[in-house]
A protein has these predicted regions:
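Substrate-recognition/cap regions that form aromatic- and gly/pro-loop-enriched pockets
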Residues: 288, 306, 314-318, 325
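Secreted/periplasmic serine-hydrolase-like ester/acetyl group-modifying domain
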Residues: 151-297
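Alpha-helical transmembrane signal-anchor/signal-peptide segments
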Residues: 25-47
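Membrane-embedded segments
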Residues: 72-162
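Hydrophobic membrane-insertion alpha-helices, especially the h-region
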Residues: 5-25
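C-terminal regions of proteins
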Residues: 96-98, 333, 338-391
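Short, flexible/disordered intra-domain loops and linkers
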Residues: 135-141, 325-334
Length: 391
């Protein structure tokens, strides 16, 4: 009688335990290819932080992962996601970035998927504004930090020990990480050689493992039911244009959409964020600099991770809008220090860089004072297409 009563309950518990403990890769077939395709243009927090979507995407050769930040939200007709839909080149861009997803966020992206990156072509878009003197702060890191990726990082035994220690110490600088007790204990066991930290981390390990798997299952359900594509903005006329014609078309579009100001800044952005405070903005960046920042160390971790994983990245160096930065008091020679430093760092790592720093005064290269748009996207599209087609 008791066996009959408790049998179904025990079976349910056993099935739940199996579902909880089996490796995540065995759950990938539950996520449809259609869902991954829909997620390619999504910029939702849940998508950017999702491991299962990244794993499924990286397993499909049709996707070209693009890592960056808030420029991806400037989704006009020239944006890679829209341009290559109108004029296919054999790949689909998969966007991994939104405001605040700087190098350290992408360190976790790469550390948690490095076993899938070998020989994988990827695009990495750098923003000068990442390289402020304090580097990424809590305000930008916290909304983009993925606990799930953090737990996967601590169980990644393929990382070189010194690199793993460096990343763990860096993560422990942030309150959002330290508030996650299990993760904090586990990271301290990696970051510090003191025995007390090692013992605590060892005791926490089985609980961290189970919690990681719970987060993986939550991620699966979110990816299945809560990720929607970004609204498309397609221009069919681009299909018949060569690169020069597309750039001219982008210039014309930019001129129409930024007629309210002399800087070539999109009307909506200028009128809502700048116009009323234009006088106060004169000289407001005179004390800023991008040539000394912890961000360079975070970028070096990105480079080292990509080297260890065997990935094939193209880095893209985006300029600032020259006339606006002149007005704001950030001198050109100081901007040049950043461009030169980041270019040399990437070249030293042995990776190609599409450097567009000479386009500061190309009026419609950027949509505002720092985000790509219009003509800038056309240049990026061409660089991506050439990179993808090259052996």
């Amino acid at each position: 009688m008791n066996k009959a009563k408790f049998g179904p309950m025990l079976l349910a518990l056993a099935l739940f335990a199996v579902f909880l403990l089996i490796p995540t890769r065995f759950l990938l077939p539950l996520l449809s290819d259609e869902k991954v395709e829909q997620a390619a243009t999504s910029l939702k927090e849940e998508k950017i932080q999702s491991m299962i979507l990244q794993q499924k995407m990286l397993a499909d050769p049709k996707y070209l992962p693009m890592y960056g930040s808030s420029e991806f939200a400037r989704m006009d007709a020239f944006h890679p996601s829209n341009y290559f839909k109108v004029k296919p080149e054999g790949f689909t861009p998969f966007l991994l970035g939104r405001g605040g997803t700087q190098d350290l966020v992408h360190v976790l992206n790469f550390a948690s998927t490095m076993d899938q990156l070998k020989d994988k072509k990827i695009v990495f878009v750098l923003s000068p504004q990442w390289f402020v003197p304090q580097g990424i702060d809590e305000t930008h890191f916290a909304p983009n930090f993925s606990k799930q990726q953090g737990y996967h990082f601590i169980f990644n035994n393929d990382l070189k020990p010194e690199m793993k220690k460096q990343i763990a110490k860096r993560l422990l600088n942030f309150e959002i990480v330290k508030k996650e007790t299990l993760l904090k204990i586990s990271l301290e066991g990696i970051a510090y050689d003191d025995t007390k930290y090692k013992v605590k981390a060892l005791a926490a390990k089985p609980f961290a493992y189970i919690y990681r798997n719970i987060l993986d299952r939550k991620d699966l359900f979110t990816a299945m039911f809560n990720i929607k594509p970004h609204k498309e903005k397609l221009d069919p006329s681009l299909k018949q244009m060569n690169w020069e014609e597309a750039r001219k078309h982008a210039d014309q579009t930019g001129a129409v959409e930024s007629g309210s100001n002399e800087y070539g800044i999109e009307d909506d952005y200028f009128n809502s964020k700048i116009k009323k405070k234009l006088k106060q903005r004169e000289g407001y960046l005179k004390n800023d600099a991008y040539d000394q920042s912890p961000e360079y160390e975070d970028l070096q971790i990105v480079l080292d991770l990509l080297k260890q994983s065997g990935a094939k990245p193209l880095f893209i160096s985006v300029p600032v809008k020259g006339p606006w930065y002149d007005y704001a008091g950030f001198p050109k020679e100081r901007r040049e220090l950043y461009y030169k430093k980041v270019h040399e760092q990437i070249e030293k790592a042995g990776y190609p860089i599409a450097d567009f720093s000479n386009h500061e005064y190309d009026k419609y290269f950027l949509k505002d004072h720092m985000h790509l748009g219009w003509k800038g996207w056309v240049y990026i599209d061409e660089a991506i297409q050439q990179f993808y087609k090259a052996n």
